């Protein structure tokens, strides 16, 4: 819902709708379990799952004997309401042995033993195969359960899991999302010591990890390691390093990699272009934004309203109202519907250069094309007109101007 420009100056009080999210009880069960809230020390020391990935670490005989003493009791008695509800939501398509482990995890209690003891007991009783491990991991990941990483690291050491390089890479990605650099590096080191090939996929995951964590030098060093593999780099490896350069505040280096990709006929993803364009745009680097915008089209990617909006914003921030207006009109000529955000950016560009007459002409053109002003564009006008102290005068002028334009010559 919007308003035409003549009424824009009187409407600035719209409120955003309240969005209420829903949460499944099955998911909440894991989050509310106090056993899942661990300190940094507990995470490193309380369970041997993490420690087992360290170099030279072996499972001692006394640990194995403790595992045998785990009290594997059938679940069903003395359940809380939440536990009972969570159990009923276990996917029926899971195998019986997987359902059994899920029930034990839901009702896990330290009085029965450690969590790794539980996994060891399940391993001996159920003789799981790789498909069972993967089924458990998938469900725990869907639940966003902290038990996921414990099961994942424990499974890597089990013959029945038949671990491969991608299993290690998934754990690196997991730690990357949490910015846990040391844990990811430990996983990579364990992977090397177990004889797995460190390939481009794994190193790209490390580049992403270092980039997100702000370790830009390590990201660049790892990217150079990928080049030393002697294999053609794919768009993911390039894209990860470009994102690292953007986060490091050197988009020029990222743009240089884009040109390198272009010379090898490798197309970056839309999100990479968008991130680079956004960086130039927010910094008011109109020339850089225009170069990236042109590169998007050369790559065969059709610009959408968000990409066009970033280009308009670059001109707006740098005070180039004429170019902002031109980019806006080109967007419309391309058949892209203008958003209120884009209209607001053009108005902001006019405000920065104090071009009131041009702004009024722009508003009249919008009204002629039946384009209504929304909350954001109206707010820009309100701020500008109040600063000038001409709210009522401008409203009257707009109406008179609009009326004169509609009369036949």
From Swiss-Prot:
PPR repeat boundaries on the chain: 164-198, 199-233, 234-268, 269-303, 304-338, 339-373
Cysteine pairs bridged by disulfides in the record: none
Domain of life: Eukaryota
One Pfam family from the record: PPR_3
Residue ranges crossing the lipid bilayer per the database entry: none
Signal sequence annotation: none
Record-linked InterPro entries: Pentatricopeptide_rpt, TPR-like_helical_dom_sf
Keywords: Repeat
Record-stated family: Belongs to the PPR family. P subfamily.
NCBIfam families, sorted: PPR
Name this protein carries in UniProt: Pentatricopeptide repeat-containing protein At1g01970
């Amino acid at each position: 819902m919007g308003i035409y420009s003549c009424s824009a100056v009187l409407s600035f009080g719209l409120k955003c709708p309240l969005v209420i999210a829903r949460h499944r009880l099955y998911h909440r069960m894991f989050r509310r379990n106090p056993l899942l809230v661990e300190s940094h020390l507990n995470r490193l020391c309380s369970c041997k799952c993490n420690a087992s990935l360290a170099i030279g670490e072996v499972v001692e005989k006394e640990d194995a004997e403790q595992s045998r003493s785990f009290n594997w009791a059938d679940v069903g008695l003395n359940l809380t309401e939440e536990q009972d509800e969570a159990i009923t939501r276990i996917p029926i398509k899971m195998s019986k042995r997987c359902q059994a482990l899920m029930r034990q995890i839901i009702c896990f209690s330290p009085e029965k033993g450690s969590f790794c003891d539980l996994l060891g007991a399940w391993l001996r009783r159920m003789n799981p195969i790789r498909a069972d491990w993967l089924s458990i991991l998938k469900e725990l990941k869907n639940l966003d359960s902290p038990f996921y990483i414990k099961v994942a690291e424990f499974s890597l050491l089990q013959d029945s899991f038949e671990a491969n390089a991608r299993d290690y890479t998934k754990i690196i990605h997991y730690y990357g999302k949490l910015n846990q650099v040391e844990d990811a590096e430990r996983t990579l080191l364990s992977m090397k010591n177990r004889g797995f090939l460190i390939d481009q996929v794994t190193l790209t995951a490390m580049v992403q990890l270092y980039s997100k964590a702000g370790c830009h030098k390590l990201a660049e060093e790892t990217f150079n390691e990928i080049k030393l593999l002697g294999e053609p780099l794919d768009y993911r490896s390039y894209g990860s390093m470009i994102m690292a350069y953007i986060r490091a505040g050197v988009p020029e280096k990222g743009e240089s990699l884009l040109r390198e990709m272009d010379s090898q006929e490798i197309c970056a993803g839309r999100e990479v272009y968008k991130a680079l364009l956004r960086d130039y745009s927010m910094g008011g680097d109109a020339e850089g934004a225009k170069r990236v915008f042109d590169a998007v089209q050369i790559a065969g990617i059709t610009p959408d309203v968000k990409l066009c909006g970033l280009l308009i914003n670059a001109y707006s921030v740098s005070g180039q109202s004429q170019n902002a207006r031109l980019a806006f009109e080109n967007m419309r000529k391309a058949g892209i519907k203008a958003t209120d955000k884009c209209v607001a950016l053009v108005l902001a560009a006019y405000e920065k250069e104090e071009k009131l007459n041009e702004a009024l002409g722009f508003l009249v053109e919008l009204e002629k094309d039946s384009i209504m002003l929304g909350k954001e564009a109206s707010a820009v006008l309100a701020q500008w007109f109040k600063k000038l102290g001409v709210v009522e005068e401008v409203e009257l002028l707009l109406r008179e101007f609009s009326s004169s334009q509609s009369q036949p010559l």
